[in-house]
């Protein structure tokens, strides 16, 4: 299976850094995942990139996906989500998820 043109484009636009080590150790899985998540899923529906990323960030807050949130935040900013929108997503989540999840996301990483 080859990586689709759409998945390649999405990767280069939103994840321009070094590739995940999984591309070396399990390229078949990564192609399957990338073609699904970065082509089939993103090309369904009418959400633009910024709206999709805001929904993803909110979902990651809800499932306490802190590490993945940190990975996807720069991509969300590249997609056009503003820092003010990121803060608003966090603020809105506090009422539903509590403050513990919020405070862990705002701690500096070392």
List the predicted regions and their residue ranges.
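Short, structured motif recognition centered on aromatic/hydrophobic residues
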Residues: 51-60, 89-90
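Alpha-helical bundle segments that constitute or directly flank the non-heme di-iron/ferroxidase center
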Residues: 42, 63-64
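Extended intrinsically disordered, low-complexity coil regions enriched in Ser, Thr, Gly, Ala
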Residues: 65-85
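Internal helix-loop-helix
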Residues: 91-96
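Structural motif
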Residues: 45-52, 80-86
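Secretory/endomembrane lumenal or extracellular ectodomains immediately following the signal peptide
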Residues: 1-49
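Conserved small/polar residues in nucleotide/adenosyl-binding loops
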Residues: 103-109
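Substrate/cofactor-recognition hotspot
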Residues: 68, 97-99
């Amino acid at each position: 299976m080859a990586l689709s043109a759409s998945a390649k484009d999405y990767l280069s636009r939103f994840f321009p850094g070094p590739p995940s080590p999984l591309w070396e150790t399990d390229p078949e899985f990564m192609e399957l995942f990338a073609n699904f998540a970065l082509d089939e899923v993103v090309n369904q529906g009418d959400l633009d990139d910024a709206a999709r990323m805001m929904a993803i960030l909110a979902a990651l807050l809800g499932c306490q996906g802190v590490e993945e949130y940190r990975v996807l935040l720069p991509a969300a900013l590249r997609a056009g989500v503003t820092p003010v929108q990121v803060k608003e997503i966090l603020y809105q989540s506090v009422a539903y998820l509590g403050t513990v999840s919020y405070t862990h996301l705002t701690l500096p990483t070392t």
